[in-house]
From Swiss-Prot, chain A:
GO terms for molecular function: lipid binding. Residues 1-225 form the SMP-LTD domain. PANTHER family: MITOCHONDRIAL DISTRIBUTION AND MORPHOLOGY PROTEIN 34 (PTHR28185:SF1). Lacks alpha-helical transmembrane segments, suggesting that it resides in the membrane via beta-sheet conformations similar to those predicted for other outer membrane proteins and porin. The SMP-LTD domain is a barrel-like domain that can bind various types of glycerophospholipids in its interior and mediate their transfer between two adjacent bilayers. It comes from Eremothecium gossypii (strain ATCC 10895 / CBS 109.51 / FGSC 9923 / NRRL Y-1056). Keywords: Lipid transport, Lipid-binding, Membrane, Mitochondrion, Mitochondrion outer membrane, Transmembrane, Transmembrane beta strand, Transport. InterPro entries: Mdm34, SMP_LBD. Residues 393-456 are annotated as: Disordered. This is Mitochondrial distribution and morphology protein 34. It is a multi-pass membrane protein. Residues 413-427 have a biased composition (Polar residues).
UniProtKB/Swiss-Prot annotation, chain B:
Residues 1-232 form the SMP-LTD domain. GO terms for biological process: aminophospholipid transport; mitochondrial genome maintenance; mitochondrial outer membrane translocase complex assembly; mitochondrion inheritance; mitochondrion-endoplasmic reticulum membrane tethering; peroxisome organization; phospholipid transport; protein insertion into mitochondrial outer membrane. GO terms for cellular component: endoplasmic reticulum membrane; ERMES complex. It holds the Pfam family MMM1. This is Mitochondrial distribution and morphology protein 12. The gene is MDM12. It is found in: Mitochondrion outer membrane; Endoplasmic reticulum membrane. GO terms for molecular function: lipid binding; lipid transfer activity.
Amino acid sequence: MSFIFNRETFEDNSFNEVLREKLMRALNLHDRTVGSSSGAMTTGTGAVECSGAAAAGQRPPRSKGGFSKVDILKSGIIVKKVEFPTIPKLEILDLDVSIQSKSLIKGICKVSCRDAMVQITTEIESNLLLLHVNSSPKFTTPKLISNDSFTVPITMTFDKLHLEAITNIFVKNTGVGISFNDVNLDFRLQCSIKLLQSSIEKRLKASMEEVFKDVLPSVIFNMSQRWFTHGETVVPTVDKSMVSSDTPVQPRMILDESDLSDLSPANMLRLSTLVSSRQTLCLNPTAVDTISTIPGCLERQNLHRFNLRFPSLYNYYSNKEQQGAHNNEKNRVEHLKLWGRSSSNPIPTRASFKVENTLPKEVLDSNSYDVRVITAIQTKMYERASNDVVLRRRKIKMRSRKPSKANKDAVSPAQNDSGTSSCSNVASELPHASLQANPQSDEIDPAPEGGPNAEDAYKEELEDSGLRAPQDFPALENVTPVLAQLPNQQRSRLGSPLSAGRPTPLLSPLDDSHWLLQKRDPQDLRTTLYSPIRNGRFYVMPQPQLDTKEASAFLLENGKRFGFVGLLNNHNLKWGNDPPPPYREVSITQ
Amino acid sequence: MSFDINWNKINEDSTINQRARAFLNEHLESLQLPSYVSNIKMTDFKLGTIPPRITLKQIDNPLDDFYEALRLEGASIGGRDTDVQFLMEVDYKGDMLIELSAELVLNYPSPNFMQLPVKLTISDIGIHSLCLVAYLQRQLFISFLCDVSDPALDNVESPLDSNGPAFLGSKAVERISLIRSIKIQTEIGPQDLSEGTILRSVGKLEQFLSDVFKNLLRKEAAWPSWINLDFNEDVSADVESSSSAEESLPHRDDAQDFSADARA
């Protein structure tokens, strides 16, 4: 028994009263609008049986098509009595929380409930002398006709209700799904009209399966949806489908003219390149350990490696990290020995996949770090990881009247915004860091109005152009701005006063990470997504405008459309060595 | 190790643990909880026998970011003579133990209709980070800069872990984990009743909780976020009253954070 029910609730009569009212309302609601969510009002584990039994009671007339119109029920259903003398048991047998998708909780529960009692009463039409005089010939008509309404009150008592069931419960943020397995239901029916008792009982038991398979889960789901939407009435999905089925479905054209016009020719070209790149007659296996085997395309399995190349503590301080890695390797070998394995066992180290953004201990001990560099890196990583998350900078007043309570003042949103912008300013204040991937930084911003507006506009432009990378592909977002920042003269400036005197590696996304350099990958990992121009392996298609302006300015001004322009690689067309293509503006006048 | 912490003193004094527990319990009671959580209590608290190692690495002028933040708040910045910033290496691999208990409540159809007791045991907390502590303009800023590599905390999993990293690729590298290792043990179900079973060690739930916890800390205290302790006297009574009126807000905010995290 995992859940504890409030004992008082069950000892108190008021709870039974509440249940009775809810049940009655539900039954009568159901009576009026057959087919709508039956018994949506009945709730709770306690009510499970009630609504089950009640719905079952309603079922036989409903299943006879059309019978519900001339319902034999002549009055509303009155629930006389509901009793829950014993506390139901609800026990969690297993629980599973999935982290990835929108919080989904799966549980297997055992429900058991006993000795419950429901008594309902209503009136039924039962004229045993009813004659269909209209359809019968005159000569057969008897003299005595009593075709008046003849209502008989009927009381049904379900007692010794006993339910045991194993249920699967799914909780999502949209509702609660439940399915019943292994239902064991037992009850005794006492009917005031003994004649009907066996018949009703038989029908009820026959319809139980449907109740637990269909009625109850949908009832609970609808109900939970109301909870999750905070009381907003949700239109039952059944109704929706009925409405939509009224209007004839128009056949929809796939890929009509307008759809095609949305695809930019540049995109189409890129897609076709992508497709054709996959077709190879090469007998050698495609290159390992390269970020892109296809020019300009980042493959899913290489995304991680691509991400690793962003400036971060582990590749910035890579020189020292190498030693650290060496030590780790030693440790690993010892680990392996502990596990009873020979040290030469080629188990792939995690290090090659799972890189933690840590400051190497050696760097810390040798004092060869710079706080400002670290802050810049961390700020940049923060910005890249969370675009929309507001910066948290709590202010706690220590001198307030109640010093014992830490009075947390949430920073107002406005301050938050400014805080965020301030921290992006940091990067621009540190020229050596040059982490600023935004085109906002002063040197390269051709539109002097600057500010966030310009940036937004720029982003919109990026989105307009078909070439924008998908959301989960954060790397490519930076491609164009980085390219824009690229000019060589800037690089020379990067030798900053802060790092003066010490030959620290440059902190710049443009530079190849030393970590990678030290790996000495035979395939030459430098795919230089960052620095196609510097690398000089590209032939930028000459365009008249390009000559007059700086590339960055060009991108910013009318960067409506970026196109993929072919590239020549100077590695004898061997795959695996191709740097990705430059993104460049296709000359389309606005 | 710059700070010599006489941890034995703490251990010898058994009242310290109790007092800390009492204080934390008091704080927990004052929290305004969402309606579906009740009775949150700290049932056990042990500081442990292993002290944190705190090393002072650098004393410097405060970073410009702090001044910038103050300036944006509209505070006038006075002389900078007394402003100072410490860079500290915090290394904690102790055996602190926290036991929390709470009850999840279903308030339908009647209030407090159904409860689910949950017990959490938190231990094995491992931190090795650089922490920036700046004091300027009578305000204290605390922010965790970055993690420091530590063989004891890196790659905690054994090399034989079958949950291969092959699909880790989707995740970008986190800038800081702050809490490098944490162990959360869960128990679901009432402790005292003998009937029925107690669901123990729900792995996924533990993972989920530790993620929520880590994310919360990362969001609140890791650079470029920070915690700002203001030692200034309140300027006027108005400010004070408004701040005390807002007192409940951050907690609710926290709860929303939590649920938002849970949904995310």
